[in-house]
Amino acid sequence: MKRIIVTREKKIASALMLYWVIPGSKQAFMQQFGLVGDLTEHDAFGQPLYRIDIAVLDANGARIKNGEQIALDLNDSVFSVFACTRSGSLSNEVYLQSGQLVGGIETYYLKMTTKGGFKTVSYPWFE
């Protein structure tokens, strides 16, 4: 078993945005749900064009709020994680290699921030 502890940094630009931490291959997820590219498009008013349903995100990942920390226990077969916004913008993919042993469990500490902002699309990013 593996455990990831994700801490999401507080950012004003994404204060009201939920992110989902999704275990598994980003490429496989994109292919399964027909996502092209990492970021969503915007309409003429600057609002994101949603390209994925919340039910899909809830079924495949765990929600994380601004400034929150979550812990997820994963199967040994999971080798990477990434994050997704409500609108379908995707983060970079983090590969889980050489975690610390804490109580006999391979543990990874991940810090998530937000890139983009007020004039461009906000999206999650693992540092």
PLM regions and their residue ranges:
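Short loop/turn and low-complexity linker motifs enriched in small/turn-promoting residues
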Residues: M1-E127
